[in-house]
Amino acid sequence: MPKRNDIKTILVIGSGPIIIGQAAEFDYAGTQACLALKEEGYKVILVNSNPATIMTDTEIADKVYIEPLTLDFVSRIIRKEQPDALLPTLGGQTGLNMAVQLHEAGILEENNVTLLGTKLSSIEQAEDRDLFRNLMNELNEPVPESDIVNTVQQAIDFATSIGYPVIVRPAFTMGGTGGGICHDEKELVEIVTNGLKYSPVTQCLIEKSIAGYKEIEYEVMRDSNDNAIVVCNMENIDPVGIHTGDSIVVAPSQTLTDKEYHMLRDVSLKIIRALGIEGGCNVQLALDPHSFNYYIIEVNPRVSRSSALASKATGYPIAKLAAKIAVGLTLDEMMNPVTGTSYAAFEPALDYVVSKIPRFPFDKFEKGERVLGTQMKATGEVMAIGRTYEESLLKAIRSLEYGVHHLGLPNGEAFELDFIKQRIGEQDDERLFFIGEAIRRGVTLEEIHEMTQIDYFFLNKFQHIIDIEHDLKDNVGDIDHLIWAKKYGFSDKVIAHRWNMTEKEIYDIRHENHILPVYKMVDTCASEFESNTPYFYGTYETENESIRSDKKKVVVLGSGPIRIGQGVEFDYATVHAVWAIREAGYEAIIINNNPETVSTDFSISDKLYFEPLTEEDVMNIINLEQPEGVVVQFGGQTAINLAEKLTKYGVKVLGTSLENLDRAEDRKEFEALMQRIEIPQPLGKTATSVEEAVANADFIGYPVLVRPSYVLGGRAMEIVYNEEELINYMTQAVKASPEHPVLIDRYLTGKEIEVDAICDGETVVIPGIMEHIERAGVHSGDSIAVYPPQTLTEKQIATLEDYTKRLAHGLEIKGLLNIQYVISNDEVFVLEVNPRASRTVPFLSKITDVPMANLAMKAILGESLISKGYKDGLVPYKEGVYVKAPVFSFSKLKNVDITLGPEMKSTGEVMGKDITLEKALYKGLVASGLQVKDHGTVLITVADKDKAEALGLAKRFHEVGYRIMATSGTAKLLKENDIPVVEVSKIGNEFNLLDVIRDGHVQIVINTMTKGKQIERDGFQIRRDSVDNGVPCLTSLDTARALLEVIESMTFNMNQM
């Protein structure tokens, strides 16, 4: 069927900021879809609030709106642009929910906008738990016994009738938000109360738990001619009960019999046909391991996290083809872009095994609730490809960057066996590693199966890995055993550990004996058709399919899995660097392991290696490809940390030299540089022991900022106010040593400023200066940033420009540079310098029209910035005001304190732009999910040191018509100053402030940290209850002031005559 000619302009809705449950996979899908629609001749208008994406680059769509994804703003864009059609199925849950809202508000009908892809009735049938259950009953397909509830009492009544445990699934949410498994009434009340709040239609499904069944997924596609295919089927190693986003997944499925595979395949195709979905769809099924009984768990009528994984696992570009299906093309008339010789209607075939492991944020949030359930907690994921299951699993494990390199924990032998068994039974994020440890200790597979319900197939594979370990130990130096271990994915590091050698010694033994990996092509067809995709994975076999070309090559290291502190911004920089390399006439080779991202789309680079970002795996590729050099400055800390290791092998690091990368990180060298170029920095010292830390802090004077050296995202960084807190930090948060010193700095309160620059060795281009709303002490990634700066003097701006140039020359920067400054008592100090891409690169590139990553890469390759039309110094400001606001995923992470500080906690970002600061801030806050209301109730409970400042804010809240609630101390101060206030009791009394928050009487909570970090602290409880009840909680008075300015700008002045 030919494509539709009755539509010319299509509006695509993006998925907004990165949050747990909705990550970089939608940037990948949206980018593919927009380009596919443009390829077919349509005019594409994109709306998305996330500036950190490739998708929001002006080249991707004909018109790009970076605006809040709310009914109000999307409606305005529809009225202005008058698109013919809307494609909502590429924007995750956000896109689907927006389509439903636009329909219900009459906006689509009023503006004659057609919905493409999946019909609204299909979306509602798949997403509304009641309609979905009814459809399954009509199809005679089994769903677990369930009921739809709109109140807590209905949930209690139903759960009592069918018996616990039950699973709660809120309607129209993603990542299992608000859901969970309940083992008793207490858990049910808590989870359903939350679930009803998070569901936009106040509806939850309560279903009989089938935890323990196998969880199987089918990624299916269908077109308007009713051609339907299975792109990929996947098996969760963790049985039903753990959200698929938090499960370890393998593709293709490993334990299904042919009968089971085809039974579930037929069911999946039957469901996509019944729903009438045109495009991609994900079907999740539960299979009884002991019979042919199965249940339908749910259907996602859109492109999803699983479809990104399926695309990368097979090479089959689901989002691209789904977009073309949406405009009427069919599978049997589109070529498969991978092979170029077969049609898209051929189902992909795999001759390898793919493993996906989630990446969790618990290295950031050590006190977070680690137990896994139906609510997702992972921020990202890694994928690895191997010829055996063992190989793909071990490659995935070493891609995680947790400090684990194998099936076990770094000091696993120190744990008691009882503790290991307890952790296996707890079903948390480290269970896989504890299973490895248990097998090492001789725990039987029967006992592990009993505790986990993990299929024996996988447990036997884990056993096989441990058996190979034992064989290695018993046969030190034996080449046959080395080859055998390499075939099953063992790294040189692990073999070196077993043989009591160094990793370099194993590397040398391999090279002497020609034990080298070959690279196989991912071609969607198991080599059945001719294919020339430049997409490879490494394995230890004989035939190498990756042929080295004669062109000059540059290798770019990607940034690995999405995690807090290292988000999609680094993938953005990586992609632009790769494009710049290709423009400059070099062959661009990328190494990365994240299935969600644009950088791992094989059409981006000349060659893609889907491999772990470790010394060994990267060196294997470099030895084969012989590049001019490697670029590390776009891949975040992941890539920077590899620079020194690669240099030892004689690899050339392109751009800023290793020596200068180290100079920016090494305390003493950096201080010497700062003195030489005469730039002030806060007084600081280094400590390698507790005693030295105490002495240094006494000399500097409290409060001090303490942190380990060489980290990203402010990991384990804290402000401490006295000796007791310092000792606590030194003994619990870090292990200081001569190799790993702790940095201790005077903590300066003042205005924080962030500057990004590009240098070619001579010219220093400064695209922009950003001013943070929150004063120094809040991590830059968690601050609201404003461009251009609103309160700086010309003298301060000139100083910032001068210091930035001095630093760029002093560090001999070639490429990018990011500097954080603090202005304290009108003096500019340097806080830190990062000689690499920063998380502000996409934001600044978009708002200044300076293609930062592209220019930096050209500078690295030796081109001058002047030849590109840029002058030395600060680029003239663009018109308007631009705000970058952080977005947090606290609602998904229990027991995590939301207080902002020097350690980063946000998962994503949004942008607001307008002609005034207040309007831009309004857009930024609304886009980040904050409901800005011009009236309501604000609860103020602050530390003593903040009371004087809070008084001024309270007065202004009162003047705009807000009611004020406060606890006794704050209330007393307000009354003394004639500000009306409702006093509420502290925690522990009847009807206290937690009741006020839980009962929905409060619209905003302002709570600043009272020292003492124990979880039981009242402050922690207030902040957690705010998050769990969907009430904005501001822990910085600067953020509160910004919000207040927005509310004031929305408020009319009411004065009596």
Swiss-Prot record:
Residues 930-1057 are annotated as: Allosteric domain. Mg(2+) 1 binds at Q284, E298. Transmembrane segments: none annotated. Mn(2+) 1 binds at Q284, E298. ATP 1 binds at R129, R169, G175, G176, K208, I210, E215, G241, I242, H243, Q284, E298. Residues 1-401 are annotated as: Carboxyphosphate synthetic domain. Mn(2+) 3 binds at Q820, E832. Keywords: Amino-acid biosynthesis, Arginine biosynthesis, ATP-binding, Ligase, Magnesium, Manganese, Metal-binding, Nucleotide-binding, Pyrimidine biosynthesis, Repeat. ATP 2 binds at R707, R746, L748, E752, G777, V778, H779, S780, Q820, E832. Pathway: Amino-acid biosynthesis; L-arginine biosynthesis; carbamoyl phosphate from bicarbonate: step 1/1; Pyrimidine metabolism; UMP biosynthesis via de novo pathway; (S)-dihydroorotate from bicarbonate: step 1/3. It comes from the Bacteria. Residues 133-327, 671-861 form the ATP-grasp domain. Mn(2+) 2 binds at E298, N300. Mg(2+) 4 binds at E832, N834. Residues 402-546 are annotated as: Oligomerization domain. Its EC number is 6.3.4.16, 6.3.5.5. Mn(2+) 4 binds at E832, N834. Residues 930-1057 form the MGS-like domain. Mg(2+) 3 binds at Q820, E832. GO terms for molecular function: ATP binding; carbamoyl-phosphate synthase (ammonia) activity; carbamoyl-phosphate synthase (glutamine-hydrolyzing) activity; metal ion binding. Belongs to the CarB family. Large subunit of the glutamine-dependent carbamoyl phosphate synthetase (CPSase). CPSase catalyzes the formation of carbamoyl phosphate from the ammonia moiety of glutamine, carbonate, and phosphate donated by ATP, constituting the first step of 2 biosynthetic pathways, one leading to arginine and/or urea and the other to pyrimidine nucleotides. This is Carbamoyl phosphate synthase large chain. The gene is carB.
